Amino acid sequence: LGDVYKRQNHHIAFYGGSSESSYRVSLGFMDRQGVILNEDMKNFTSNMNMNQKMFDGFLNCELGMFGSIQKNHNLVDYQKTFYSAATFNPTYPNHKDPVTNSWDGITTASQITNPLAWMEVQDDDATSHISTHARLTFNLLEGLKLNLFGAYTYNIVENSQYLPTSVWANGQAYKGTKKRESLLGNMMLTYKKNWKKHFFDVLALAELQKETYTGYYTTVSNF
């Protein structure tokens, strides 16, 4: 077990533009080291937005993208880890037995495991996400606009776990993945007009969306 909690945060952003165009880009990174050995988290994010007016205001183009990656090394069982650390015989060595290549343990206590054996457990997860969008606005006539919008989202979550025989009877390993993809597109035509004492506001809209989910998981033991 360690005794220092460490965390780093880094952010950077830059932007610029004019009356006809603008952009902004930002990046972020976070690194967190837990107080327990092999427990940590890393996260990276990026974001970009751009806007451009073209053809004397006839067309306005907007683009955006966001992405993130986060990786975690987790502690499987806080209770058993801290309970073992608090109750285990402190005179036992902090290394494996060179003859048996296993951790020394208390055979008469079924719920007390060598706390260093828990440090060999692997429980990792990673999440990746990306989202992009684009919007085109056409100023066709006075009061008449056409908007085209499209977006794509991709998300994947990966989990993996390894429990050696020193902490789990017969051992166990797990691997799983979940993916999600989403496509969205819409078209909107608007017309607004003042005529004498009347005001006309007409809207025509069409939209299409598709989502796909895939994944798998598997667990093995007795190794």
Where are these regions (language model features)?
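Predominantly transmembrane beta-strands of Gram-negative outer membrane beta-barrel pores used
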Residues: N9-D31, V35, T45-K53, E62-G64
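Long hydrophobic segments that form regular secondary structure
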Residues: L141-E142
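Surface-exposed loop/interface segments of Gram-negative outer-membrane beta-barrel transport/assembly proteins
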Residues: G2-D3, V35-E39, T45-S131, N147-F223
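A short catalytic or substrate-binding loop motif that flags glycine-/basic-rich loops and adjacent residues
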Residues: K6
